[in-house]
Design a protein with these regions (language model features):
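Outer-membrane beta-barrel porins/channels
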Residues: 21-23, 52-55, 59-61, 78-80, ...
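N-terminal, post-signal peptide beta-strand-biased segments of exported outer-membrane/organellar beta-barrel
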Residues: 2-108
């Protein structure tokens, strides 16, 4: 099984994090470590979610039940790249650059929906989280087709939010460190590989400004465990898949001023961890062309979702195709996502008992497309 087919499946798998749980935008794949020889790659993705909801209860004269939120999830681009070197027969190294977490939420101001400013004079609600990650890895090849690998990851993160009720918060830009460790077994003659990777949590201690007042809080990017596998099942045909667990129940954004004003609520938090399953088939059509199809599933957790992230689980289908030209490989991929239905809860300031539904976000979807260019040198 040649590199062209493996590159096709790699881009197909990478696209699955575009709508993953929490605020994850990149799974931090270490697949580059298993490329043949010296290798460089660059990926560009465009993600266009379509997430909208309907208000279930009135929140004032200008914010009635039935108000439509409009699409609250702006499209965004995603960049990543990496370089891998063969240092010796037993040692290989790689540097990976990605955007591991991110979020973009924008409730329009002219909809009547509460978070769009339907019952207040402060306008809509906007939130943004940005990050940049750099990972350095070493892989040591042991006898019997076994390898171990590990390294350090630095993540730089910042964010800001402004809500319909006049609350505004921005953070400092913080850079902190975590680590990755893993092990793999390979059988190259049938393109078989199983790899297990653990990524540690990374905690940021932010300085923040809430409505002009200096505050501080901590947020933890959660730990994760990823099992990836692939094997040839027939001439020029590869089956691949993964199972990824992320400890999202440990993630929260809880600035102290917001918590005090709302009786201890968080801006963003998650009650449950997520497990994402991916399964696909790759096929080499010729020495120059290969393709792949894949499906991905993340179960809904139930309960309420946050008003700044009203989704719950997802199901997706994706395709990718690769063209090899000399030492270059160019891959195009696309994925359509059925985003899980979600309900959000009324804020504590409204005269409703806890557990009252504010918004129903149903029948939402998204489209992700990507381009990857790889070069063997």
């Amino acid at each position: 099984m040649t590199r062209i087919l493996l590159t096709t499946t790699a881009l197909a798998c990478a696209a699955t994090t575009a709508f993953a749980g929490g605020v994850e935008r990149s799974a931090g794949s270490v697949a580059i470590l298993f490329e043949e020889g010296n290798w460089a790659e660059f990926s560009l993705g465009y993600v266009d979610p379509d997430i909208s909801g309907v208000q279930a209860v009135p929140a004032g004269p200008s914010s009635p039940a039935g108000a439509q939120s409009g699409d609250i999830a702006p499209a965004y681009t995603q960049l990543s790249g990496g370089v891998k070197w063969v240092i010796s027969e037993d040692v290989e190294a790689a540097i990976i650059v990605d955007q591991p977490i991110g979020a973009s939420v924008d409730y329009a101001t002219d909809t009547g929906y509460l978070y769009g400013g339907g019952s207040a004079a402060f306008g809509g609600s906007v939130a943004e989280v940005r990050s940049l990650g750099i990972t350095g890895l070493l892989k040591y090849n042991l006898p019997n087709n076994v390898s171990v690998y590990g390294g350090l990851k630095a993540v730089k993160t910042s964010g800001e939010v402004s809500l319909f009720n006049g609350y505004a918060m921005s953070t400092s830009t913080e850079t902190d460190f975590g680590y990755l460790v893993g092990a793999a077994w390979e059988k190259p003659e049938i393109a078989a590989r199983v790899a297990l990777t653990y990524a540690s949590e990374i905690t940021h201690d932010f300085a923040s400004t809430e409505n002009g007042s200096p505050t501080a809080f901590s947020t933890t990017i959660p730990q994760s465990l990823t099992l990836e596998g692939q094997t040839g099942v027939a001439a020029d045909t590869l089956v691949f898949g993964s199972v990824r667990w992320v400890d999202w129940s440990e993630f929260d954004i809880t600035p102290p001023g917001f918590a005090f004003a709302t009786g201890g609520s968080s801006l963003v938090d998650y009650d449950n961890d997520t497990i994402t399953y991916t399964l696909g088939v790759g096929r080499r059509f010729s020495e120059e062309w290969s393709g792949a199809v894949l499906a991905s599933y993340e179960a809904a957790q139930g309960g309420f979702s946050g008003n700044l992230g009203p989704t719950d689980g997802s199901t997706s289908l994706g395709v990718a195709v690769t063209r090899a030209i000399d030492n270059y490989e160019i891959t195009l991929g696309a994925r359509y996502v059925w985003i899980g239905d979600a309900e959000t809860e009324t804020p504590s300031a409204l005269p409703y008992p806890p557990g009252t539904t504010l918004g129903d976000f149903d029948d939402n979807s998204g489209l992700a497309v990507g381009l990857k260019v790889g070069y063997q040198f």
